[in-house]
């Protein structure tokens, strides 16, 4: 089959994902998953979750380019992008991935700082007198 393109997002991170049928290779920013993340097993599991749920670990090749944010947000953006790419690759994966919430964009992001306050919600100490 042809290459499929999808994007995933989380916080300020964006992941561009290309998926094609193959033998299970996964490269993120030109590196293997182990080289990119080092010893973060929980983050590796999050990236691989859509492939594990859809049982496609060894049947597709994936190339991911990530921009912005930290490792955790980039990993979640990659997970979102891989899920969307699987659905674009074959529509039957939608019914498999949807119950796990893998196709839903996590809209939580940092709340902006307001003027007159120290942070988004933290006020300066109140003095009664």
Swiss-Prot record:
Query: What keywords is this UniProt entry annotated with?
Result: Ribonucleoprotein, Ribosomal protein
Highest taxon in the source lineage: Bacteria
Q: Does the keyword Ribonucleoprotein apply?
A: yes
Q: Does the keyword Nucleus apply?
A: no
Recorded GO CC terms: cytosolic small ribosomal subunit
Mind listing the GO molecular function terms for this protein? RNA binding; structural constituent of ribosome
Q: Which residues form a coiled coil?
A: none
- Any one GO BP annotation for this protein: translation
Family classification? Belongs to the universal ribosomal protein uS9 family.
Question: How is this protein named in the record?
Answer: Small ribosomal subunit protein uS9
Which gene codes for it? rpsI
